[in-house]
Amino acid sequence: MKKSKEAVFEDKDYTEENPEQIFGNLYDGKLTVQDGKVKIAYDGDGNGYYIAFNSETGVYYDPYGDTEYDISVLFDANGNSFVFADAPTVEVLAGEQEQTEAEPDYLQYVGNEAYGYYDEAGEWVWSGYFEGDQWISTLPQTEAEEKQFGFEDNIETTPTASEDFGLEADVPAPEVAEPSYEVQPEVAAEPVYDVQPEVAVEPVGETTATVEPQAVEIQPEVVVEPIVESQLEQPVEVQAEMVQPEVAVEPQLEVSLDPIGETAPILEQVEPQAVQTQPEIPAEQSAVELQPEPVAEVQSEMVQPEAAAEPVTEAQQTEPTPVVETIAEITPQVVTEPVVAVVEHQPEAVAEPLPVEPAVAGVSELIPTEQVQPEVVVESTPVAEVQSEMVQPEVAVEPIVEPQPEQPVEVQPEVITTPEVASVLEVQPENPVVEVEQVVEPQPETPVEVQPEPVVETVQEAVAEPTQVVEPQPQAAPQPAVYEWNLTPEAAPVEQPEVIPVTVVESQATATAEPQPAVAPVADMDYVLHLTDTVKNQPQTAPVQPTTPIKIEVAESTPTVTTSPVEPTIAPPLFEIELNNTTSSDLPLVEVVDFKHNQHGAVGTHSFDDFTPPEVGMESKTHCHSNSEVVWRVSEPKTVPVPPAVSSINIQTVNRVVEPTISTPTTPVVESAPAIEIFVDTPPVETKEASSNVDVVQQPVKPLMPVMVEQLRTTELQPTTEINLFANSDINSIIAELKQGRSNPAINFDDIFKMSSYQMVVKKSFVQISDFITNSKTDITNRFLLIKKELQAELTRLIEENEQLKAEFLNAKDLSVYQKDELLRSLSNDFTIAHRPSDSYEQLQKSGELVRNIQKAILENESKIKNIQITLKELKAVYKLCSDTVLNGMAKLDSVLRFNKKEKDPLLLNSMETLSSFETEPQAIIEDLLDFSSSFDKMSNEQLDEFVYQNLDSGLNLDLDGFDHQLSSMNIHGLEPLDPMKLDDFDFETLTPDKTSNLSSILDDELMENGGDFNLDY
């Protein structure tokens, strides 16, 4: 509707109370402001908007259009944030939605015969009606009750007690596991057991592994507890009803794995009476913190008749062995189940002594006598054979990581003889084996037939008397321990003993050594032996003195001694190292001589523990002079399989001096652990009889500043005495010559001040600087010309390629246009069927794809051409900057060589002959010399230049030309990154260029000008 000009532009007093005066009468039956459904909001500029709210979508929109608004950026008439007051909140909408969802959906009962039926026409007919949630049937009462029962049975399924118990039975909490035996018969009905059930170690959560202090001598019994009668009978009935033959009532096995693995849980079956009165295993009395432990994984339900136990270490034999009732003791109890699951993971028994409290419970008479496990006490013997009369599932226990010799434990498997379990074996393989993954140490595995104590019995002979050193006699070479590495595939892998006790007597020569003369007594010396454990960087309190390190590396069965003396010492201590093995095979001992040196050569021994072969790195340091010190580093390296090696140690004594001569076989280097140092402090030696004749291998001292050494090597400034003007090596002789007062001393000024040497060094320096600048300029020019040539060649190639692509593009475009016309023509006449327009369409598609590819290649080439042009421009600018830097260096060098020349040369006075006649004052002779009364830092540049650089260019050939070299073929890929600013490091800051110098002959101007021309237009 058009309005008159006066109606539109009439001057009226528009107010916010009457917005219709602004927008006119727009009411067409829609929402209006008067009914409260439409609000007015304003933006930041004062523009007004009609706002309505859609309760279904929650969107604010224009009621007279389709525009949606964000009210967070709008304001009301007072300038506050706009709020749509009548808009229902989100909570109200949510409540309505919940109310809508709460209404019963009666359509879900369509098709259920309890609520109706389908008539002949296929339409659903209700047999009653709903009052709220209540179904009221109009059928006869008996039928209605049955239907109602069916309805409730289909709609609501109340959880049974078995389901409630099934959910609780999987929880290993103690308070939940006790009442589980009261409703145990319904466990098999739980569908959760279709998946492999989690088997806990204990039927009662409270019966975790406890500790008893006096468990070293008395080993707890292996108790087999009966299962509840209801557990044996009820699962069969439930299985018959639920038709689940694979469901088995598994004894709840709770694998109590301590985070450190300090205790081994006790697996046992307890009667319900013992469950409720469990006095011996309260949680607070246990020395182990009770925590929910991971439940052992159950493999496919099979009876495992074999069990392979891990070797038992001797450390474990001397410590309490917790009772571990394996699944073998529990499997016969589940006599009514067709399938018996086997625990995959066996809890570890760690050799840390903790008090174990044996859990004893009564044995049920329901279990046959042949199933009862007798008391098994593990003897503390190297090989323990545990024969069990129970069904032993083959469960490989994880190896205990202990650096102790482990011995195998042979377990004799038994065959199930109970009639209940015999039925299980009928449907299962005869020998189902659960292969448990074993943690294999990086060591060669040995068969079960490992000798109990593989000790090299080569040092059982008596050591020399402490007060006397006798002549060593040849003896048989130590027999290395031989192991059979023939492992059969069926043999279970047994961990090799990590520690092979080795005994070495250093004072005795082996078969490969010749007899040596006896050692005479040495000076009286008292040594103090003390053992310290070094931790990483332990500071040494002894003073730093030249040392003689003796490194001894012992292989598996024989030692390896490496000697690297650094400096001869006075009266080296007579020492003896013996690696002795104890019968306990717990901790091998190292017997080290306590150095009690006296006039009679007495030698005593001390033994210390915490020494672990097979690989021992020992380092001996002996300080000379007053404080002699021997440091032995005994390290515990990681076990590395090393073939048995035989080493010979020859102790030679020459002139009362012990000179160790060691021949060692090559053995692998072992990564050593933190070392143990033995410091042997020795008092000063007063006698000179025991002089050392040890061969000294003096290691060269590494230079502190290899960079400076390299720089000096590349320069010609080798004579350092020429550089140092203040060297006082010959000044004393000069002074003595002058003091004699001779009329013609044989000394000239040059000898006094060494200026000739100085001049030669300076000249050589300038020659090197000149050569460096010349070579730098040549290198810069060659690099620039080569890069420029390659880039221009690439530009030419890209331009030619683009021209060819443009021609191909035109041809492909014409072809696509022709094919398009042909396709349209074939579709518009009767030739369509014979022409097969589908082929024409495919050809047109191929032509179009070809056109697009050519166009893409052209655009890429154009981008490359543009980038290369920009690179050439930047390269030219950088080249000019580098050239200017080199020119600056040349100008400074020229100014230095030609600055302020003078005719007189005071250094031409080669002798002091003129001083013979006192007609000339000495001050007048040396007036042209530099005044040395002032310090060097107070000299002016003019004085320095006048004194130093006079006539330096005489005979100095500085050929700075030669920049017109021809461009040689170079590989651009071998160039180093261009760094134009690196030449600034060679700037001479203390020198100023001569403004009058003419360097036009230094550079080839034509080369400089033509080197940066570019032909960037293509």
UniProtKB/Swiss-Prot annotation:
Coiled coil: 782-815, 849-880
Entry keyword Protein biosynthesis: no
Intracellular or extracellular location(s): Cell projection, Attachment organelle membrane
InterPro entries xref list: Cytadherence_HMW-1_N, EAGR_box, EAGR_sf
UniProt keyword annotations, A-Z: Cell membrane, Cell projection, Coiled coil, Cytadherence, Membrane, Phosphoprotein, Virulence
PTM comment text: Phosphorylated mainly on serine residues.
GO CC, alphabetical: attachment organelle membrane; cell projection; plasma membrane
Cited Gene3D superfamilies: 3.30.70.3600
Major location category of this protein: membrane
Claim: tRNA-binding is one of the keywords in the record: no
A Gene Ontology biological process term: adhesion of symbiont to microvasculature
UniProt cross-references to Pfam families, sorted A to Z: EAGR_box
Record-linked NCBIfam families: EAGR_box (TIGR03834), termin_org_HMW1 (TIGR03836)
Function: Component of the cytoskeleton-like structure which stabilizes the shape of the wall-less Mycoplasma. This cytoskeleton-like network of accessory proteins containing HMW proteins 1 to 5 allows the proper anchoring of cytadhesin proteins in the mycoplasmal membrane at the attachment organelle.
Protein name per its UniProtKB record: Cytadherence high molecular weight protein 1
Upper lineage: Bacteria, Bacillati, Mycoplasmatota, Mycoplasmoidales, Mycoplasmoidaceae
